[in-house]
């Protein structure tokens, strides 16, 4: 992807929860961007040859000298700069302005009034005030505020509690915004970012699925040559897109290993083998390891221990199959850009203990002695989906709800047994089927069933019975960091409950989880 990455837009991260959202908004414009720590090395910066820089927000306060600052050389680089929230405040302080903590903090919506003309905000408005001023509805999240402009800057917008809500030095193409244009609550936020990125930075807009695929194929062929590549295919979005991309790039040089853990969704193994094996012609080695996984999980109830056992057992099975293939030189993984960002951020943080391992193939042993191939490591999840569609993968596969790496193992709140997995598989399939039938599936972010290890009395015909409880979970979220429980219609839930109790032997009661995140997590374990 070298040509598409020429002169990218850089985002320097000061720790904001919205940093990745900024990058996703920039990518939506067809512009390639990368996220780097705020203290990026000058030599590395020069090699990247960026077209412009965005300074993100962050949780710190610039009123403390020890807190993060942008490299001072950045302000002498002659590149367009945009500081957002904390990014604006550190820009102001480092260029000679003043920032103070405010007693009138702003969190949430605010009405922004534009001042005169600025290249960044001109002709962008939600409505007009009585005096003719342009007004914008924006999203604020700050306690500090700029109280004195740096030399050369002018005020470009204000709110009731922040007289300097935006500033600009047009001659040096430096801009600061106290609000967050990257969040959807700022209605014109994408237009504002586009004004900076495309109009001011003159960024190239060639970052499209077609171009991404073309560049990726060229890079794969250049790296791999005539050597063979091994991929652990799970049926999830990331590994599916990698499989389709590699198959298009190198054809029969790709070998996939699919491990049936016994903890997959109903008919999932058959669907994966049919789609990639029979229809696409990819060579797949299918391994039924259900007994091995269930034996390893016998007697284990601790969620974290279950995860470790499932991960360790997968590695053993995968390694065993890989050792049989003596002509493999490469191991492909479905690493995506958020994984890369997380790993980079954690590696520079002494307090960080655990990096989330990549589903299924994360932590494969060094004894494989294979070279690593990560063809989608520069893509966000939504970009992976767009590439998948462009490669011809079915919409329902590409937009399937997330499924945890340990599978049903962490949706059975007890020791994992085949009986429990079979009950849960059937109940979950009914829930998902009815969501599709009611055209609700793609309106929610994630839905699944959970097996509860308690028995509840029920009545079937003239008899009483004690059977298990199934809990249904459905959430709506943008980033999976926070989530609302989905307010599905009661008659719909009643229909699903009735079907599960009548069609799944061993279930006497169905409940619905109405917990948000926080305080709950999306998964139960």
Swiss-Prot record:
Q: Which reaction does it catalyse?
A: XMP + L-glutamine + ATP + H2O = GMP + L-glutamate + AMP + diphosphate + 2 H(+)
Q: Please give the Gene3D superfamilies that the UniProt record associates with this protein.
A: 3.30.300.10, 3.40.50.880, HUPs
Domain Glutamine amidotransferase type-1 residue range list: 8-206
Superkingdom in the source lineage: Bacteria
* Documented EC number(s): 6.3.5.2
Q: Which GO terms describe its molecular function?
A: ATP binding; GMP synthase activity
Q: How does it assemble?
A: Homodimer.
Its protein name is GMP synthase [glutamine-hydrolyzing]
| Species of origin | Legionella pneumophila (strain Paris)
Report the gene name: guaA
């Amino acid at each position: 992807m070298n040509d598409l990455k020429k002169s990218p837009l850089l985002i320097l991260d000061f720790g904001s929860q919205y940093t990745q959202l900024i990058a996703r908004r920039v990518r939506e414009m067809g512009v390639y961007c990368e996220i780097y720590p705020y203290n990026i090395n000058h030599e590395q910066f020069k090699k990247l040859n960026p077209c412009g820089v965005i300074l993100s927000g962050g949780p710190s306060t610039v009123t403390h000298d020890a807190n993060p600052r942008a490299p001072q050389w950045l302000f002498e680089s002659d590149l367009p700069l945009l500081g957002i929230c904390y990014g604006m405040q550190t820009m102001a302080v480092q260029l000679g302005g003043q920032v103070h903590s405010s007693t009138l903090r702003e969190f949430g919506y605010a009405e922004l009034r534009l001042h005169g003309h600025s290249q960044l905000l001109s002709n962008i408005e939600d409505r007009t005030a009585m005096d003719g001023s342009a007004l914008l509805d924006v999203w604020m999240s700050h306690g500090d505020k700029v109280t004195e402009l740096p030399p050369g800057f002018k005020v470009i917008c204000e709110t009731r509690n922040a007289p300097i809500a935006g500033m600009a030095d047009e001659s040096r193409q430096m801009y600061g915004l106290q609000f967050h244009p990257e969040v959807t609550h700022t209605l014109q936020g994408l237009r504002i970012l586009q004004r900076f990125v495309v109009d001011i930075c003159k960024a190239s807009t060639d970052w499209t699925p077609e171009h991404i695929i073309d560049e990726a194929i060229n890079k794969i062929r250049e790296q791999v040559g005539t050597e063979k590549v091994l991929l652990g295919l799970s049926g999830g979005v990331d590994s599916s897109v990698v499989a389709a991309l590699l198959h298009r790039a190198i054809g029969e040089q790709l070998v996939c290993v699919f491990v049936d853990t016994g903890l997959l969704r109903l008919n999932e193994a058959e669907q994966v083998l049919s789609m990639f094996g029979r229809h696409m012609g990819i060579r797949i080695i299918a391994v039924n390891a259900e007994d091995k996984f269930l034996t390893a999980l016998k007697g284990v109830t601790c969620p974290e221990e279950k995860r470790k056992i499932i991960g360790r057992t997968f590695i053993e099975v995968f390694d065993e199959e890989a050792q049989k293939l003596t002509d493999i030189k490469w191991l492909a993984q479905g690493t995506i850009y958020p994984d890369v960002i997380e790993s980079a951020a954690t590696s520079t943080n002494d307090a960080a203990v655990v990096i989330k391992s990549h589903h299924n193939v994360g932590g494969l042993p060094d004894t494989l002695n294979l070279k690593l191939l990560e063809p989608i490591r520069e893509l966000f999840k939504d970009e992976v989906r767009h590439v998948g569609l462009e490669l011809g993968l079915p919409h329902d596969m590409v937009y399937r709800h997330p499924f945890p790496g340990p599978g049903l193992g962490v949706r059975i709140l007890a020791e994992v047994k085949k009986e429990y997995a079979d009950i849960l598989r059937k109940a979950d399939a009914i829930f998902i089927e009815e969501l599709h039938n009611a055209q609700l599936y793609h309106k929610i972010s994630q839905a699944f069933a959970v097996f509860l290890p308690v028995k509840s009395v029920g009545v079937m015909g003239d008899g009483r019975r004690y059977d298990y409880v199934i809990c249904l979970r459905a959430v709506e979220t943008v980033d999976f960091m926070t989530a609302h429980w989905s307010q599905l219609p009661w008659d719909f839930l009643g229909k699903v409950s009735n079907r599960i109790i009548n069609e799944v032997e061993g279930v006497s009661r169905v409940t619905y989880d109405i917990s948000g995140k926080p305080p709950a997590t999306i998964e139960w374990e």
